[in-house]
């Protein structure tokens, strides 16, 4: 007896069209274009979940660098001073501190500067 694929194919197409909901034009209406768009979107999502970690680290370093240069210290000198002072704040916390509480960040910079001098 021949196996007809009606139910299986319909479920597969409905699943893809559901994932493509909100895409523009034929990307959400026609199965073939929707399938291509969904595959591309899933690839981009996978890639960008990994890229996001790099991008945020770059942003934090840029913010820390700007804040430390305003205090007369370069980024690499600041990080070296933190390591020597045994201050274990990660870059995310340092960037938040520089952005939200500049006075506290100034104290951290001074501690790093003093540990570098000694």
Curated annotation (Swiss-Prot):
Disulfide bonds: none
Domain of life: Bacteria
Sorted UniProt keywords: Ribonucleoprotein, Ribosomal protein, RNA-binding, rRNA-binding
GO CC, any one term: ribosome
MF annotations from Gene Ontology: rRNA binding; structural constituent of ribosome
One annotated GO biological process: ribosomal large subunit assembly
CDD domains (alphabetical): Ribosomal_L20
SUPFAM superfamilies: Ribosomal protein L20 (SSF74731)
Function (record text): Binds directly to 23S ribosomal RNA and is necessary for the in vitro assembly process of the 50S ribosomal subunit. It is not involved in the protein synthesizing functions of that subunit.
Family according to the record: Belongs to the bacterial ribosomal protein bL20 family.
Record-linked NCBIfam families: rplT_bact
Name of the protein: Large ribosomal subunit protein bL20
Organism: Synechococcus sp. (strain JA-2-3B'a(2-13))
Higher taxonomy: Bacteria, Bacillati, Cyanobacteriota, Cyanophyceae, Synechococcales
Gene name linked to the record: rplT
């Amino acid at each position: 007896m021949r196996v007809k694929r009606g139910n299986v194919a319909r479920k597969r197409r409905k699943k893809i069209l559901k994932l493509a909901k909100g895409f523009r034009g034929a990307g959400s209406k026609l199965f073939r274009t929707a399938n291509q768009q969904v595959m591309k979107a899933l690839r981009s999502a996978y890639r960008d979940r990994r890229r996001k970690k790099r991008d945020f680290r770059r942003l934090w370093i840029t913010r820390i660098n700007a804040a430390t240069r305003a205090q007369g210290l370069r980024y690499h000198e600041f990080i070296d001073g933190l390591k020597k002072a045994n201050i274990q704040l990660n870059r995310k916390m340092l960037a938040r501190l520089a952005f939200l509480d500049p006075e506290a960040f100034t104290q951290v910079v001074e501690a790093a500067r003093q540990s570098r001098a000694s």
